[in-house]
Amino acid sequence: MPKQMRALYGAAWQFTFLMLLIDCIWAARIGFRLERSGVALTIALTCGLVVIDAVLWIVSRVPFKNVDRSMFYRHVLDAFLWLTVMATFSKVGVVFQYLCVTTNFPLATHAFIAADAALGFHWPDLYRWVQAHPWLHTALAWAYKSGACQLLVIPAILAVTRNTQDYAEFVVQFMVSATLVILISLPFPAESAFVHFGIHDPNTASTVSDFALFRNGHTRELNLSLAQGLVSFPSLHTILALCYAYALRHVRYVFPMAIALNALMIVSTLTQGGHYLADVLSGLVAGAVVICVVRRVVFRLAVPAAEQIPSAVTS
């Protein structure tokens, strides 16, 4: 990993530990706690990634006669190093999200519904229409769930095609995006459209049931293994869809497919994620801003212009 990238990587870990410190202090003050089995599993998974990182570091130092082979292992190592910090930050960020929910600010749900109405959008009508078309419901459900799969597939693609700097940029985008949406949602909390409109089909209101429980103080114990996404405004799924496609921009034949899949994922957030149209539109704006800021400010300062050109653009 180039010196400038190592500095950015170190900064990512510093930010993660800073948020962890905030989590610990805040949790101690309000009696918030983590269920032990979830913590144990999280630690085990993190340790597993660290072990893989160590093995890859050793392999990447082997003096292979084939230079391409040596470079391949170095790119795989870089991808796993960034994956490790992102996985760790994800858990720390989830706790921060739940802590913010406990602040119990007045709900902004009606403001978002009013904004939707001003645009001529009525969420229940769209939901019922999608439900009346099983093939469309299945396609949108698949696209929505692809978000989690892409978190694992994208680093593999970028490692194999030697575009690991693009993956590093994506991880920074992920961290900035997650922090941004949580901070925005702090003074503007909103219950999911599933909850507001009383939708109790499978994988609807049950996926955001923690919102009311932690908001009202009925529980203060979180199982990290069963954590839910509780931020409605803006939509993190929408932001990540933009970042996913952008991360694959230098992988020639995969990029068009990434655009199509993530465009469908953005549409799916309305009915599969229980988001209001205001959530999605704000997510599009926030996503564009995050990509621009990370690229033009954070990443440009960390990596000289000459190094920002991918070493290989392959299919």
Predicted regions and their residues:
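Membrane-interfacial catalytic/cofactor-binding modules of polytopic membrane enzymes
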Residues: 183-250
